[in-house]
Amino acid sequence: MPKLCILSNSHGFIHPEVVKIANQCDIAIHAGDIINESTLSQLKPKQKLIAIQGNNDDHISSLNKIEFLEFPSGKIAIEHGHLHGHQKPSHESLRSAYPDAKVIIYGHTHKQVIDKESTPWVINPGASGEIRNHGGSKCFTMGIYDDKEWLITPYVFIS
């Protein structure tokens, strides 16, 4: 069972508790707006770090705008989300872009969202840093147990 830490919108700072969770997971996923690439060096998951460009990361040319992660029980699509609606990315637009995914991860809004109303699920971990974190730095963990159970757990840390 792989365990993932999902974060976004760090804007140069990741809350220490989010770093701690990421480093205890097998895979860490950062859904963009990193701002300072050295921020990623704090993240040392057991197996793999995946990070994508956000709308403020054009200067980090080593990162892709979209990434995919595949498991026997489904695929995860990762993008920042800003191209699907600037103020509030459209979940229907994201679902149309990645119809074969089980989960779509996006960032951009700084707001934590778990939308399981239809497949693929659309999730946003919220802001992991201090800027516009709407009541605390946030992240998700996701445990992939088998074909039927993918468990998402939200975290909020008040500084």
Question: Locations of the language-model features?
Answer:
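Glutamate identity and glutamate-enriched acidic tracts
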Residues: 37, 67-70, 79, 117, ...
